[in-house]
């Protein structure tokens, strides 16, 4: 399945919630009618079955992290193999993706921009360039911007935007040095309460 390249707000409207696919901190409901589905007048949302609700939740999380369908299923399989709560394991794996960590640290304004920074070899982990967005960052790893990329205006703009967002407690960021430490794997209470990972587990358990 190819990566979606269309309007970002359309995806958020389809899921009925802000997926944080656009840069900035302004609430998405000030930009568009989030309660309406995509379309000139917004198609009336049908009443969903249990399966439909589970599918929508999976799509919402998958699109939030910018992961393709096959990748997402593989993350679920890995989460199910690990000890502990499968749903929480899934979120931890998604949060540990390098592109997501770059975004959380404020080096990219969006996850898509952060993914581009990684693929363009602008990101280092423990002093070595890593160009794979799905690379799993582990506790105590140091993530930094390469020297030649520190002057990019988009990186500076992203750091300014990040100052307006809530700072993740599981990360330690030095904006001046443009580097951060992945201190620990985030706990469920650290992450958005808007995600219902139990629905995703129910979907894949069928």
UniProtKB/Swiss-Prot annotation:
GO terms for molecular function: rRNA binding; structural constituent of ribosome. Residues 96-156 form the S4 RNA-binding domain. Keywords: Ribonucleoprotein, Ribosomal protein, RNA-binding, rRNA-binding. One of its GO terms (biological process) is ribosomal small subunit biogenesis. Gene3D superfamilies: Ribosomal Protein S4 Delta 41, Chain A, domain 1, RNA-binding S4 domain. One of its GO terms (cellular component) is small ribosomal subunit. It holds the Pfam family S4. NCBIfam families: PRK05327.1, rpsD_bact. PANTHER family: 30S 40S RIBOSOMAL PROTEIN, SMALL RIBOSOMAL SUBUNIT PROTEIN US4M. Part of the 30S ribosomal subunit. Contacts protein S5. The interaction surface between S4 and S5 is involved in control of translational fidelity. Belongs to the universal ribosomal protein uS4 family. One of the primary rRNA binding proteins, it binds directly to 16S rRNA where it nucleates assembly of the body of the 30S subunit. With S5 and S12 plays an important role in translational accuracy. This is Small ribosomal subunit protein uS4. It comes from Erwinia tasmaniensis (strain DSM 17950 / CFBP 7177 / CIP 109463 / NCPPB 4357 / Et1/99).
């Amino acid at each position: 399945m190819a990566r979606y390249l269309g309007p970002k707000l359309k995806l958020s409207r389809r899921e009925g919630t802000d997926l944080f696919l656009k840069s900035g901190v302004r609430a998405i409901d000030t930009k568009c009618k989030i309660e309406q589905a995509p379309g000139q007048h917004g198609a009336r949302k049908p009443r969903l079955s249990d399966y439909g609700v589970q599918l929508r939740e999976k799509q919402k999380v998958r699109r939030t992290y910018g992961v393709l369908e096959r990748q997402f299923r593989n993350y679920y399989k890995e989460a199910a193999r690990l000890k502990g709560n499968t749903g929480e394991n899934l979120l931890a794996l998604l949060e540990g993706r390098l592109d997501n960590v770059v975004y959380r640290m404020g080096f990219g304004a969006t996850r898509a921009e952060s993914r581009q920074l990684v693929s363009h070899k602008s990101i280092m982990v423990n002093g070595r360039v890593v160009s794979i967005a799905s690379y799993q960052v582990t506790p105590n790893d140091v993530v930094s911007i390469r020297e030649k990329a520190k002057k990019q205006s988009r990186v500076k703009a992203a750091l300014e935007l990040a100052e307006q967002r809530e700072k993740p407690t599981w990360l330690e960021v030095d904006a001046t040095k443009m580097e951060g430490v992945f201190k620990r794997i985030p706990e469920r209470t650290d992450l958005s309460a808007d995600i219902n990972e139990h629905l995703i587990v129910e979907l894949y358990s069928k």
